[in-house]
Every structure is written in C-alpha cells, then in structure tokens.
C-alpha cells in the first residue's frame, strides 16, 4: 500500500474496503476523509487530485479499518449532526438518529406557551432537549439521565452549543424531578425487545444495551413513563414518546387506558410509526 494518496484514490480505496461490511460505504468514506482533512464535502470533489499528507493517509486508513470492524462512524469521529447541530458522542449513550428529529418537530408543533416547561427523560447526548432549546429559547427545559457519564456528555454538548439555559440532572426517570407542572414531557426511552436479534448486528453492537432494550417486549419503560408522567404534567399538558414502528397500536391503547386524550401517532421520514402523543386533562385518577 502506498505511503500517500490523492483524495479520489483514497475515497475509492475506502469504498472498496467498506463495501462488504457497510450499507453506507460511500457516505462512510466521505465522512471519515472529511474528518481527516477538516474540510467540507465540496472540497473533496473540487480538488480530487489533491494529495493527502503521509500522516493524513495513515490516519484515514486506521479509521477505515475501525469502520470495517463495525465501529460506528460517529464513534470514530466523536461527533454526529442532529437537527443541524453538532453533537459530541461516545459509547456511553445512543448515537442520535435522524428519525428522532420527528419527535423534535412534533414537539415544536404543539400549541405551547412561549415559556413552556418541558422535561426530557433519558436525554443521553442531550440531543432532543438541546434541539428544542435551539428553537425555543424561552422554554424552560429540564433534561435528565440516570447514567452519570451521559449527564456529563449532555452538559458538554450544552456548553459547546451555548445553550446553558437547559437544566441537566442525573435522575432515574422522575426520581430527582421536583416540578409537577410540566407543559410537555418527551422521551426516547429504551424500547427494543431484549430478545431482538438485531441487537447483535450493525452499529448497535457498540451502543449500551441499557439505552436500547426494555422488558415486556420493549414496552416496560414506555408504559412506566406514560403512567408516571400524569403526576408531573399540568392539566392540558402533553406527553410525546418515541417508539418502535410496530409498537404504536399498543402504546396508543395504553395512553387511552391511562386517561390521555387526543392520542395520535406521527410517522417518520420512512413512513413508519415513530412517535405517539397524548394530552393529559388532569381529570382522571387511574
């Protein structure tokens, strides 16, 4: 293997290396090379003949080899874009997914006051809470996670994005939450069945299982949040939960059973059921 390469050759080499192990080999190669060069995508195709330095080429090869081993690109570069914001990521929590932007969009579309109080449960990187804060500066947002390292990561992203108005706490779901007058409670909790065979495939192998799986065929945390949230929502407050595409029917039924009204599901960019919401009137004690 040569000690140096130009951009076009490096991309082609990386694609060949990754084609058998990644469904997004072209994109992976681009993202990794952009990170090595600290350039934007246009640069790659404007200057395909530009030579990489010996150090850049060596580093790029090492990163491609890690990707061949299945390590997520976001973990290799330490960053993932979400809601057009750069988030620091690591292996202590989930990598933000594009589908979760539907939850953010749905929250922003709710008829809330300009100073609404919002709680984000299981915040992980802080992606949902910080994306909302970037759009609604006056919202009073609290984000919680039970994992100490995840809380530290969310705080680092808060500082990096200059969104210090967001309160971030360590809390096992509601355990450290003292307010009981939220206008909106959002969560992307663990919702994958513990027996799901896909947990042993692809990028999720490198993410914490505790952030992915839940008991009761993946419904345990969804049901717990839906039930407990009623004690933390003000009358006419909303709950908004992300879930698996096959869980919408049962989750809607559970929300209705618990006394929520105006229960509805929103589909993601792939037309899969992704988020379900309900309005808590504060009138039924169940």
UniProtKB/Swiss-Prot annotation:
Its function, per the record, reads: Methylates the class 1 translation termination release factors RF1/PrfA and RF2/PrfB on the glutamine residue of the universally conserved GGQ motif.
Annotated family? Belongs to the protein N5-glutamine methyltransferase family. PrmC subfamily.
Residues annotated as binding substrate are 188-191
Protein's gene: prmC
Per the UniProt entry, the Enzyme Commission number(s) are 2.1.1.297
Coiled-coil annotated residue ranges, if any = none
What are the alphabetically sorted keywords of the record? Methyltransferase, S-adenosyl-L-methionine, Transferase
Q: Which reaction does it catalyse?
A: L-glutaminyl-[peptide chain release factor] + S-adenosyl-L-methionine = N(5)-methyl-L-glutaminyl-[peptide chain release factor] + S-adenosyl-L-homocysteine + H(+)
CDD domains from the UniProt entry: AdoMet_MTases
Name of this protein: Release factor glutamine methyltransferase
One MF term in the entry's GO annotations? protein-(glutamine-N5) methyltransferase activity
Which BP terms from GO are recorded?
methylation; translational termination
Q: Which residues bind S-adenosyl-L-methionine?
A: 122-126, 145, 173, 188
């Amino acid at each position: 293997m040569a000690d140096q390469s130009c951009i076009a050759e490096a991309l082609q080499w990386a694609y060949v290396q990754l084609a058998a192990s990644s469904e997004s080999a072209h994109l992976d190669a681009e993202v990794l090379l952009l990170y090595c060069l600290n350039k934007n995508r246009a640069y790659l195709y404007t200057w395909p003949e530009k030579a990489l330095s010996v150090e850049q080429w060596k580093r790029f090869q090492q990163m491609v080899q890690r990707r061949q081993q299945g390590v997520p690109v976001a973990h290799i570069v330490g960053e993932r874009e979400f809601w057009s914001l750069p988030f620091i990521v690591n292996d202590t929590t989930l990598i933000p997914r594009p589908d979760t932007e539907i939850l953010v969009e749905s929250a922003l579309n709710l008829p809330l006051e300009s100073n609404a109080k919002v709680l984000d449960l299981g915040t992980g990187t802080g992606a949902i809470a910080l994306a909302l804060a970037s759009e609604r500066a006056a919202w009073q947002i609290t984000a919680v996670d039970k994992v100490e390292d995840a809380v530290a990561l969310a705080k680092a992203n808060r500082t990096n994005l200059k969104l210090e108005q967001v309160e971030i706490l360590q809390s096992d779901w509601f355990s450290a939450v003292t307010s009981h007058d939220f206008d909106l409670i959002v969560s992307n909790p663990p919702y994958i069945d513990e027996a799901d065979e896909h947990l042993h495939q692809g990028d999720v192998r490198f993410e914490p299982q505790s952030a992915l799986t839940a008991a009761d065929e993946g419904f345990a945390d969804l049901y717990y949040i839906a039930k407990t949230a009623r004690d933390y929502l003000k009358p006419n407050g909303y709950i908004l939960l992300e879930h698996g595409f096959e869980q919408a029917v049962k989750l809607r039924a559970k929300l209705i059973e618990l006394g929520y009204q105006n229960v509805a599901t929103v589909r993601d960019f792939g037309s899969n059921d992704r988020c379900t919401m309900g309005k808590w009137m504060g009138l039924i004690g169940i």
